[in-house]
Amino acid sequence: MKFSCLFSALLIPALVVGQVDIFGYFESEFDHITVSDRGYNYGYNKLRLDLDHSGIDGAAFGANVNIQRYYGNVKWNMLDFFPNEIWEPIFQPLGIEEFPFAVADTLYLDNAYVRLHFNKGDVTIGKQQISLGVGYAWNPLDIFNTKLLLDPTYEQTGVNGFRIEIPVKDRANVDFIISPGSDWKNSTKMITGKLGLRRFDLIGTIGSYNWKRTQLDFQTFQSQYLNLERRMAGGAIVGEIGGIGIWGEGAYNTLKDAENYTELLVGFDYTFENGLYCLAEFYHNGNSPEKFNALDLNNYLQYLNGETHSLLQNYTFIIWQYPLSDFVSIGMINFANLSDKSAALNPQLEWNAFEDVSISFLFGYYMGAENTEFGLQEWNGRIRMRAYF
């Protein structure tokens, strides 16, 4: 019933004024993960509907609806995902061995926006994709999103905002972004400029917003938010030299009542003559602790909630891809936490079984001490099928 009302509310206005395009995909995934000597089987079925209408003079409408239903193990013990040194001093004296949480089915409006076209630029209003930066696995400039290391390019949830894009000249433009909060002080404000120079693009960004970070009271076990006034200034460069793609991205963040910090990323990619593709990145997050023994439970909660880009400071990410045929490719995703010396190897296979159907297989093997970020997990596997329509 809820879906019918939501779908009708999106579809009827577009049908009144003209033709609407409806497309999307169905995705089914099964996963297994072994962590802290416990195995979890789980998965989901997901339907994504995309609505697009560009038949209005000077305007375009777009929306996405996601319906996702989980199966298998939908109730988890959160303490399995923390090293014993992190949770035992807090929970064991109270006789607590489990901190359960459940994964709930979802039905939500991922994006819904109108884009207005003017002679001097475009204005986009509504819940929209705002993804900043040039990095593949991390983006120091992006204060709206965090990425999954096993799937950095997976779609991100839209941001409620107001965006003005003004082209200044060829290969140069300025963006103004506002994401409303409870008042002006708690709203996110950003200005981004982009300039193309020969084989390179230069990006400059400034912004300010209220940074919410989870804080668990260890006496009452009630969650609350720590609000930090954050101002960010940064930039990025992306281009190509001798067939090698190179990029860099950085941001300096000033915080009221907290220590300022820097985030940096550098990367490159290259495709060999035989079709082998390689990408590598190094990332530094000055806001995260440098050593494992400086972590506490709140650091883990903030990372799991997507409130920080990384758990510790220094990371590498490497991906290899090779086409075996027009329909089958193999690859490897490797990432490492240089701060605690843990890492993961994730071989994968992608099969385009039919014209609009792909099936992927992934296996993950994790290395490091049991109290490290990736060493805590033993192995995982994933099978994903996606069919477009």
What spans do the regions from the language model cover?
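Transmembrane beta-barrel strands of outer-membrane/channel proteins
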Residues: 24-30, 63-69, 125-127, 176-180, ...
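Detector for outer-membrane/organellar transmembrane beta-barrel domains
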Residues: 235-335
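Residues that define the transmembrane beta-barrel architecture of outer-membrane proteins
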Residues: 41-45, 105-110, 156-160, 185-189, ...
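Surface-exposed strand-loop-strand hairpins of Gram-negative outer-membrane beta-barrel proteins
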Residues: 30-45
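Outer membrane beta-barrel
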Residues: 57-172, 194-195, 368
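Outer-membrane beta-barrel "beta-signal"
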Residues: 318, 322, 351, 357-358, ...
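Repeated loop/turn-to-beta-strand initiation elements of outer-membrane beta-barrel proteins
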Residues: 20, 57-61, 120-123, 171-174, ...
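Outer-membrane beta-barrel architecture
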Residues: 48-50, 112-115, 163-165, 192-194, ...
